Amino acid sequence: MSDFLPFSRPAMGAEELAAVKTVLDSGWITTGPKNQELEAAFCRLTGNQYAVAVSSATAGMHIALMALGIGEGDEVITPSMTWVSTLNMIVLLGATPVMVDVDRDTLMVTPEHIEAAITPQTKAIIPVHYAGAPADLDAIYALGARYGIPVIEDAAHATGTSYKGRHIGARGTAIFSFHAIKNITCAEGGIVVTDNPQFADKLRSLKFHGLGVDAWDRQSGGRAPQAEVLAPGYKYNLPDFNAAIALAQLQKLDALNARRAAIAAQYHQAMADLPFQPLSLPPWEHIHAWHLFIIRVDEARCGITRDALMASLKTKGIGTGLHFRAAHTQKYYRERFPTLTLPDTEWNSERICSLPLFPDMTESDFDRVITALHQIAGQ
């Protein structure tokens, strides 16, 4: 229908169009100066020292795990309540994903669940900053230090998220996403920030065929026309078109996230009169980026299942999302790990629903959602 309200819509405008035109007019449209500007801007945003732009957060996860030397016989701990790309990258490198449970109300991976899963084969811990809120980084980094295990933060939902006064990605290594539904987007893209210069160098090489420099380095730096392959790598570089759009979006981040926060506050107020349960907020000091606004639809409490609620909203012209179906319940992982049970993850996976939340939502859009929820709840 023409008036369908989507679950998400990117906030694009004249600034993004002008950014693309600038790249077109420059004559250099692949990875180049706009990538360098984006990397510098993300270092300023996060407070970290190095940033490497990539074609997607999935690509960033792949080469980050490769740079750590993850491979056959290794284990990597991650929550099952995450997008499956993380699990896929672990498996494709020959390692074993060790999926752990989350807190029932915040859906954050907990230090207790992580520590219980550590073995001599554990080579990395990947906490997820879920829905725009931060995981408990102090406790997780303390675990990593105690056991000598690297931490890679999945910050795909966390552009604009802060933990105890510092932006996510301020220390260690974190991977952000610029996918179309994220808080800032360039359609597809991502960036890895890190405080380790050797690690950053490995990422730069792995993202571009294993070469020591990319085409822009050779063009602008007067390097030798044929670069040297240091080790086999991939084609995960980000075109300057995308980088320019991401830069334009980054300049709007505070305003975009402020609007998200205002809509989330309205949702919380409205939920007081409805049977649907929003996620709880983490107790530690933080700034929430409100990438998602998630409710739990428990049939015993709400008189309707999550799937039925989503179908009913669709008939009313309202889109929703599911973030996420637990990874260990997906066909491949269910067959590979048939005895794995994660009670709180599974309880939420069957009940969570993401409501429409994007900066260009109008008050009329919001009222439509709340009116529909009241109608479905029989109020």
Curated annotation (Swiss-Prot):
Q: Coiled coil: which residue ranges?
A: none
EC no. given is: 2.6.1.87
Which Gene3D superfamilies does this chain map to?
Answer: Aspartate Aminotransferase, domain 1 (3.90.1150.10), Type I PLP-dependent aspartate aminotransferase-like (Major domain) (3.40.640.10)
Its BP terms in the Gene Ontology are:
lipid A biosynthetic process; lipopolysaccharide biosynthetic process; response to antibiotic
Q: Which GO terms describe its molecular function?
A: pyridoxal phosphate binding; UDP-4-amino-4-deoxy-L-arabinose aminotransferase
Function text: Catalyzes the conversion of UDP-4-keto-arabinose (UDP-Ara4O) to UDP-4-amino-4-deoxy-L-arabinose (UDP-L-Ara4N). The modified arabinose is attached to lipid A and is required for resistance to polymyxin and cationic antimicrobial peptides.
Name recorded for this polypeptide: UDP-4-amino-4-deoxy-L-arabinose--oxoglutarate aminotransferase
Q: Which organism is it from?
A: Salmonella typhi
